[in-house]
């Protein structure tokens, strides 16, 4: 069977690999960008230009480790440990009342998982101390880029294991390195990549579909898999999943802005990203990138104030809130566009 996969991010390429292993399918992968990577994609250039830095968990990512082994990719070549100290930071802010609330939540979630998949962490966790509330409500931003009134209690309990029991890593050099290696191995397996190809509409029949790309080309055979972010998926899935599509996948969609600080010498942050997120008005999550001279400052909680702040003012406010040494340059990562003084695109992602 011919299988069309729209989206060449890690998800789309992982699906393609599993399908190609069967040796029963022709796999074609499409992406609107110039190369593979999805939200991990980075443009060419001397400076890092990323949508957002990524935190991954070594012991928890068993499927990724297995996939890398099959592809001949070394985990340690792709990722390097980060000094985030998130777990010790959490412990500093919790008291016995908070431990009791977390323990109760874990028992309730694990004994009735389906129920708590539809209840937010904020509604399920119960009473917390002021410091515990600040830590837990901010931790969800570090875990998955969403606030605690969006993350489900089930997702929090399962994800908390990753944070507490697994060493944290970020991209070594850049996410482009991983994307290029995965693409190379897929091509060896027979995958066909088509870039600068944006799917803009899907028409659904009873047992058929027509996918329409921006250049007017169409696909209508075999199977269509959309490995794309939820924000884009909502417009393409339409009512094919029922009338409540917005309710099903809308809440797990988030955007982010990444402000990049460039230095001419190595920089060290005095606090963890969790502490900065707890203490700054914009809940900024800063991490020093692998070159040790670039700080990636991600903002996921996009309030109306942030959305209506012009780029130059936003850069100034982020610098002032972090209280770090003055950088040589302050840039905004790809995926953000402003129109009439308001952010109109912030690189929509999925938290699932």
Description of each model-found segment:
Residues 2-29:
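N-terminal Rossmann-like FAD-binding beta1-loop-alpha1 element of flavoenzymes
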Residues 11, 35, 231:
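Conserved Rossmann-like nucleotide-cofactor binding loop
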Residues 20-44:
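Glycine-rich FAD pyrophosphate-binding loop
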Residues 42-66:
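N-terminal glycine-rich dinucleotide-binding loop that anchors FAD/FMN and/or NAD(P) in oxidoreductases
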Residues 58-153, 164:
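Mobile amphipathic helical/loop "lid" adjacent to a hydrophobic cofactor/ligand pocket
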Residues 158-213:
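Helical element adjacent to the flavin cofactor pocket in flavoenzyme catalytic cores
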Residues 200-306:
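Mid-domain catalytic core of redox enzymes
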Residues 281-352:
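Conserved flavin/dinucleotide-binding core of flavoenzymes
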């Amino acid at each position: 069977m011919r299988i069309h996969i729209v989206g060449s991010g890690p998800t789309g390429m992982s699906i393609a690999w599993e399908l190609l292993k069967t040796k029963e399918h022709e796999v074609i992968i499409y992406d609107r960008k110039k190369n593979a990577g999805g939200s991990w994609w980075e443009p060419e250039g001397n400076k890092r230009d990323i949508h957002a830095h990524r935190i991954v968990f070594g012991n928890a990512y068993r499927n990724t480790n297995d996939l890398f082994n099959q592809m001949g990719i070394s985990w340690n070549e792709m990722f390097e440990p980060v000094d985030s100290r998130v777990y010790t930071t959490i412990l500093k802010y919790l008291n016995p009342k908070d431990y009791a609330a977390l323990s109760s939540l874990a028992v309730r979630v694990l004994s009735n998982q389906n129920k708590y998949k539809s209840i937010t962490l904020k509604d399920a966790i119960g009473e917390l101390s002021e410091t515990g509330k600040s830590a837990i409500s901010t931790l969800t931003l570090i875990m998955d880029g969403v606030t605690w009134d969006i993350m489900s209690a089930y997702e929090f309990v399962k994800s908390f294991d990753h944070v507490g029991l697994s060493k944290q890593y970020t991209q070594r050099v850049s996410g482009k390195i991983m994307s290029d290696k995965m693409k190379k191995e897929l091509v060896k397996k027979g995958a066909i990549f088509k870039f600068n190809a944006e799917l803009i509409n899907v028409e659904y029949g009873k047992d058929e579909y027509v996918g329409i790309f921006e250049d007017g080309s169409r696909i209508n055979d075999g199977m269509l898999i959309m490995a794309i972010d939820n924000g884009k998926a909502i417009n393409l899935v339409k009512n094919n999943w029922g009338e409540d599509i917005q309710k099903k996948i809308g809440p797990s969609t988030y955007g982010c802005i990444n402000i990049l600080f460039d230095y001419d010498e190595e920089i060290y942050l005095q606090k963890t990203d969790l502490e900065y997120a707890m203490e700054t008005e914009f809940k900024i999550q800063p991490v020093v990138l692998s070159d040790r001279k670039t700080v990636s400052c991600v903002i996921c909680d996009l309030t109306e104030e942030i959305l209506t702040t012009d780029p130059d003012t936003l850069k100034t406010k982020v610098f002032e809130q972090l209280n770090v040494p003055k950088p040589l340059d302050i840039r905004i990562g790809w995926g953000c566009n402003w129109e009439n003084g308001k952010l109109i695109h912030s690189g929509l992602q999925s938290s699932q």
